[in-house]
Amino acid sequence: MTRRRRSRPLTRDEVIDAALGIVDAAGLEALTMRRLAADLGVEAMSLYYHVPSKDVLLDWTVDRMRTELRLPDDVPGDWADSLEAVFMEYRRVLTAHPNMLPLAARRTGTEGMSGLEFLIEQGLPVEDAVDLYQSLVGFTVGYALLGSAAIEAVWSGLPPALGDRLREWRDDTFRRTLRTLLDGYRHRERGA
C-alpha cells in the first residue's frame, strides 16, 4: 500500500488534533504513534520532530481537550461560585470526550497548579485548598463517567421515561452535590 504524501509541512497542532480525534473515535488504546502517523500521512519517526515522546503527546492531548472549556469572564459571587461554573463546564467537556476520562483523571497538567493557586489566593489554607481541589477533580471525573457511552448503553435499555429521569437525576445531583461541597469549604473558610 502506498502512503499518501503530505503537500505541506506537519504542525504540532495537527498532531495533537489528530491524536485527540483518534482517542475520541477509537479509544485511548488505539492511539499509537504508528496509527497517528498513518492518519497524518507521515512516517512514524517524523512525529518525533514535533512530539518528544508519546507521554508528552498524551499530556498535550489532555491540554487540547481542556481548551474546549468555555469559562465566563466574570462570575458574580465569590470563589465558590466561580469554581461551580468551572467544574460544571469541566464535566461538560469530559462528557464530550469520554475516551479521555482515564487520561484526564491522571494528568492534571498546569490547570492543577493554577486551581490550587486560585484557592490559596482566595484565603483557603494550603491543606484545605489541596483537599478541595482534589475532591472537585475526582468528583467531576466520576460524574463524567456516569455520562459515558457505557452507562448510556445500559440506560437505553430502560423504559424511556426512566432513562430520561436518570439523566436528569445525574445532572441535578451533580450540581447539588458540587454546591454542597463548595458550600462546606466556604463555611470552613468563613469560620476560620
Describe the residue ranges of each PLM region:
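Helix-turn-helix
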Residues: 14, 18, 22-56
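A contiguous pocket-lining binding segment that forms or flanks enzyme active sites
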Residues: 113-145
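Hydrophobic alpha-helical connector segments
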Residues: 71-112, 126, 133-136
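DNA major-groove recognition helix of helix-turn-helix
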Residues: 51, 61-62
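Actinobacteria-biased recognition of intrinsically disordered, low-complexity terminal regions
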Residues: 1-13, 20, 34, 186-192
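C-terminal peripheral helix-coil segments that are non-catalytic and often amphipathic
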Residues: 2, 124, 149-192
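Amphipathic alpha-helical interaction segments
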Residues: 14, 56, 85, 89, ...
